[in-house]
């Protein structure tokens, strides 16, 4: 008879005391927030004026309407710059206006003056860099507040958002904007609301 082969030993690890679990790795340090790219400073000398002479003449006439200097020196205050831009059909945010003005201090807005030659490159820059949202952008932004998914938002919530976020509107501005938009339940169809705003 052939000798018996020894049976393989069972894994001793199963019978031995379990090994201690390795210590958990230290939590990774929170990644620093990436730096926002710095906005390039506005440099009027690098702006190429592309308006026609006729357009420039029209702009000059509009600019002159805002001139409050005693001798009609063709100057406006920094604080009037946004108003003149908007009167000429542009729609810059207050932040954009302040950026092209070189981010003046609050007290400088009513004291510092600019002439038309200083203003024209600002107008050219703002008119070329229109970053206005599309209908879809606005609808998508309001859809966030559509809790029911039925195409409406609460009028009270929209009032609050318009008065407290981004470029805040005054109570009067909010009321004018929302006049006649709410249904009997205080809800607003936001697609119709965006069409109403964009048509204004």
Curated annotation (Swiss-Prot):
Segments for region (Disordered): 1-42
Entry-annotated residues carrying N,N,N-trimethylalanine: 2
Domain called EF-hand: residue spans: 54-91, 133-168, 168-200
Keywords, comma-separated and alphabetical: Methylation, Motor protein, Muscle protein, Myosin, Phosphoprotein, Repeat
Highest taxon of source: Eukaryota
Modification Phosphoserine occurs at: 184
Biased composition range(s): Low complexity: 15-32
Tissue: Expressed only in ventricular and slow twitch skeletal muscle tissues.
Positions carrying Phosphothreonine: 93, 132, 134
Basic and acidic residues: bias regions: 1-14, 33-42
GO process annotations (BP): cardiac muscle contraction; muscle contraction; regulation of striated muscle contraction; regulation of the force of heart contraction; skeletal muscle tissue development; ventricular cardiac muscle tissue morphogenesis
Gene Ontology molecular function: actin monomer binding; calcium ion binding; cytoskeletal motor activity
InterPro entries: CALM/Myosin/TropC-like, EF-hand-dom_pair, EF_hand_dom
GO CC list: A band; I band; myosin complex; myosin II complex
Modified residues (Phosphotyrosine): 135
Post-translational modification summary for this protein: N-terminus is methylated by METTL11A/NTM1.
Subunit details: Myosin is a hexamer of 2 heavy chains and 4 light chains.
Described function: Regulatory light chain of myosin. Does not bind calcium.
Protein name: Myosin light chain 3
Organism: Rattus norvegicus (Rat)
Protein encoded by which gene: Myl3
């Amino acid at each position: 008879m052939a000798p018996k082969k020894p049976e393989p030993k069972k894994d001793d690890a199963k019978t031995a005391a379990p090994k201690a679990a390795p210590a958990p790795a230290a939590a990774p340090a929170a990644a620093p927030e990436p730096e926002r790219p710095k906005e390039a400073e506005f440099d009027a000398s690098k702006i190429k004026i592309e308006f026609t002479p006729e357009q420039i003449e029209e702009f000059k006439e509009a600019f002159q309407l805002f001139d409050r200097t005693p001798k009609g020196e063709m100057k406006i205050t920094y604080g009037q710059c946004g108003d003149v831009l908007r009167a000429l059909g542009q729609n810059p945010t207050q932040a954009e206006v302040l950026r092209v003005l070189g981010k003046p201090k609050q007290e400088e807005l009513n004291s510092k003056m600019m002439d038309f030659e200083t203003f024209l490159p600002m107008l050219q820059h703002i008119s070329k860099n229109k970053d206005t949202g599309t209908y879809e952008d606005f609808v998508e932004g309001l859809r966030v507040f559509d809790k029911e998914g039925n195409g409406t938002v609460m009028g009270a919530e929209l009032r609050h958002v318009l008065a407290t976020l981004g470029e805040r509107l005054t109570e009067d501005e909010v009321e004018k904007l929302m006049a006649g938009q709410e249904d009997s339940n205080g809800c607003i169809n936001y697609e119709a609301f965006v069409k109403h705003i964009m048509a204004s």
